[in-house]
């Protein structure tokens, strides 16, 4: 979930001011599944889910925007933008032929394996050829939020609000 947290923090470009999380485990061990809802200062709301219980691999992101829905499938390397359109097409004499209620754009993506790309980037940073894509402040912020999500799952009755923006 740490990569999802980092991605959402980067996309939202605002501090997290609200947090609600739930999850659990199947036995006496680490947490098996988590669902966290993050509220950002700028009004963005993000919902993250991570599960070790599912037999299906799911790595996706949906972003609800003012005039579109963006859906990304990281495993299949697809990105679709759903846009609303309210255009009416009619014949010369006013008879309705059809209505375009929306359209879907398919954005071209690369099929680079994310783990390979991450390790390659790490090696380039160690060799001094690149600077880290995620700096220390970004990583610290993501880790702090991951820790708060874990605390909320471990102690669901605490009801402790997020005291300071992250």
State where each predicted segment sits.
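C-terminal helix-rich "cap/oligomerization" subdomain common to oxidoreductases
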Residues: 41, 121-166
